[in-house]
Amino acid sequence: MIIGIDFDGTINNMLETWIDWLNVRHGTTVKIEDVVEWELTKVFPTLSKKDLFAPLSDPDYWSAVTFKLDAVEVIKKLFDEGHEIYIVTSSSYKTLVPKFENCLFAYLPFLKKENVIITYNKSLINCDILFDDAEHNLINFKGIKVIFDALYNKNS
């Protein structure tokens, strides 16, 4: 089986780390429960977009991002069973090096760069199944769609 797995928010705790990172650096008090939609500018209204997105280019931030419970073990098991595993991300090119070096390949060293697909249009991906936390990434995908539950996608 060819399996596509979104990276941010699906298998890692990016959002939790991002909120903590911003709270410490900017004196804000946002909690994960406050994030009930995609637009983070609404929960951090006092921050500029530059300040809001700055952590995503910081290697130290990506070193602090952890993976969700059992994610590494499940992905490794699927890989060992012979499934083709692809990490499918719509990340900005500016964040790719720190994200991959300090997080993705640190947790999933059995994957190679050939197992990573970068695209803003996940409907182009030719996988049998796609796991994602964003409904808009699954809408036109032609295979089996699995949406990961999150506070920000409850109204999707």
Language model region names:
Residues M1-D51:
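Active-site neighborhood of HAD-like aspartate-dependent phosphohydrolases
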Residues W38, N121-C127, N153-N155:
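A short acidic, often aromatic-flanked loop/helix-cap motif at beta-alpha or helix-coil junctions
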Residues V43-D58, G82-I85:
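Short, basic/glycine-rich phosphate-binding loops at helix/coil junctions
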Residues W62-T66, A71-E101, T119:
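Substrate-recognition element of Asp-dependent hydrolases with the DxDx(T/V) motif
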Residues E84-Y86, I129, V146:
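A structural signal for isolated positions on well-ordered beta-strands in alpha/beta enzyme cores
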Residues V88-N140:
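Substrate-recognition "cap/lid" segment bordering the active-site pocket of phosphatases
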Residues F131-S156:
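Acidic, Mg2+-coordinating phosphoryl-transfer loop and its flanking beta/alpha structural elements
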